[in-house]
Amino acid sequence: MAGKGGKGLLAAKTTAAKAAADKDKDRKKAPVSRSSRAGIQFPVGRIHRQLKGRVSANGRVGATAAVYTAAILEYLTAEVLELAGNASKDLKVKRITPRHLQLAIRGDEELDTLIKGTIAGGGVIPHIHKSLINKTAKE
């Protein structure tokens, strides 16, 4: 009889463990955003919704298209902000203005070709033609 009692105790423990495991299965996991899964800051879900609204093929957009688009936008934003931050630091100012963005974008050849439009409040890039420079100032 002593042997049977031990088995019964073991069986009771396993059923309790199974019940606890079933209880864990019933619990819902916290939702994880697609942005955090991809390891980026830009909102993948919002970009996916925007892409679906703009496409003409019945709103069909692949799941990875939004992730790639968000990653590209995040990279370009970080690049522009880094250059604009350097421009504002050179001018000893703590706030980035449209002028700093203009100087950063026009100073980089690749960003200049990518962003050809006018930046409101950006001013103009300083440039003096060689023929206008005084000959005495050259020497």
Swiss-Prot record:
Source organism superkingdom: Eukaryota
InterPro entries: Histone-fold (IPR009072), Histone_H2A (IPR002119), Histone_H2A/H2B/H3 (IPR007125), Histone_H2A_C (IPR032454)
GO molecular function: DNA binding; protein heterodimerization activity; structural constituent of chromatin
Keyword Ribonucleoprotein: no
CDD domains: HFD_H2A (cd00074)
Record's subcellular location: Nucleus; Chromosome
GO cellular component, one term: nucleus
Start-end of Basic and acidic residues biased regions: 20-29
Region annotated Disordered, chain positions: 1-40
Ranges of Low complexity composition bias in the record: 9-19
SMART domains: H2A
Keywords per UniProt: Chromosome, DNA-binding, Nucleosome core, Nucleus
GO biological process, one term: heterochromatin formation
Oligomeric and partner information: The nucleosome is a histone octamer containing two molecules each of H2A, H2B, H3 and H4 assembled in one H3-H4 heterotetramer and two H2A-H2B heterodimers. The octamer wraps approximately 147 bp of DNA.
Family: Belongs to the histone H2A family.
Function as written in the Swiss-Prot or TrEMBL entry: Variant histones H2A are synthesized throughout the cell cycle and are very different from classical S-phase regulated H2A. May replace conventional H2A in a subset of nucleosomes. Nucleosomes wrap and compact DNA into chromatin, limiting DNA accessibility to the cellular machineries which require DNA as a template. Histones thereby play a central role in transcription regulation, DNA repair, DNA replication and chromosomal stability. DNA accessibility is regulated via a complex set of post-translational modifications of histones, also called histone code, and nucleosome remodeling.
Name under which the protein is recorded: Probable histone H2A variant 2
